[in-house]
Amino acid sequence: MPTPKKGARLGGSASHQKKILSNLAAQLFENGAIKTTDAKAKLLRPYAEKIITKAKNGTLADRRNVLKLIPNKDVVSHLFTELAPKFEGREGGYTRIIKLENRKGDNAPMSQISLVTEELASKEAERATRAAASKKAAEEKAAEAAEEKDEAAEEK
C-alpha cells in the first residue's frame, strides 16, 4: 500500500494510519458493524471493500496479501470462508455508512459502518413488483370509476 501523500492522516503518521485502518477492518469483519468517527469510516470504506474483493477471488495469493494487511488469521479465515460467499452476487458496495449523533465528550461526528449482507433484488424482481403495483392501482381506479357510474345511475 503506498504512503498517503495528501491531507491529514489518522494518528499522525502514515504507518500509524495503516495500523488504524488494519485494526478497524479486522473489527468490521469480526463484528459486522462498528461505530467510529466519520473521518475513519470514510477512509475505512474503500480499504475494506478492496479487501473483500480479494476475499471473493479466494486464491492463496489473495489470502496472503490480505494477511499482510490484516495480520489476524482468525479474522482472515472468517472473511474468506463465511463473509466472501455472501458477497458473491454483489459487485461492490459491500459496506454502508450511517451517520449517528455527535460524540458526547468532544462533539466529534460519529458514524456506523456496517457490512451489507442482504441479498440484492434482481432487476426482474424489481420490475415485477412495480408492474404488480401499477396493475393493482389501475384495478382500484377502474373499480372506483365503476362505483361512481353506479352511483350516478342510481341518482337519476
Curated annotation (Swiss-Prot):
InterPro entries, A to Z: Ribosomal_bL17, Ribosomal_bL17_CS, Ribosomal_bL17_sf
Biased composition range(s): Acidic residues: 147-156
GO terms for biological process, alphabetical: translation
GO MF terms, alphabetically ordered: structural constituent of ribosome
Annotated keywords: Ribonucleoprotein, Ribosomal protein
GO CC terms of this entry: cytosolic large ribosomal subunit
Compositionally biased intervals (Basic and acidic residues): 136-146
Region of interest (Disordered), ranges: 127-156
One family name in Pfam for this protein: Ribosomal_L17
NCBIfam families reported for this sequence: L17
Family: Belongs to the bacterial ribosomal protein bL17 family.
Description of how the protein assembles with itself and partners: Part of the 50S ribosomal subunit. Contacts protein L32.
PANTHER family: LARGE RIBOSOMAL SUBUNIT PROTEIN BL17M (PTHR14413:SF16), RIBOSOMAL PROTEIN L17 (PTHR14413)
Official protein name in the record: Large ribosomal subunit protein bL17
Gene assigned in the entry: rplQ
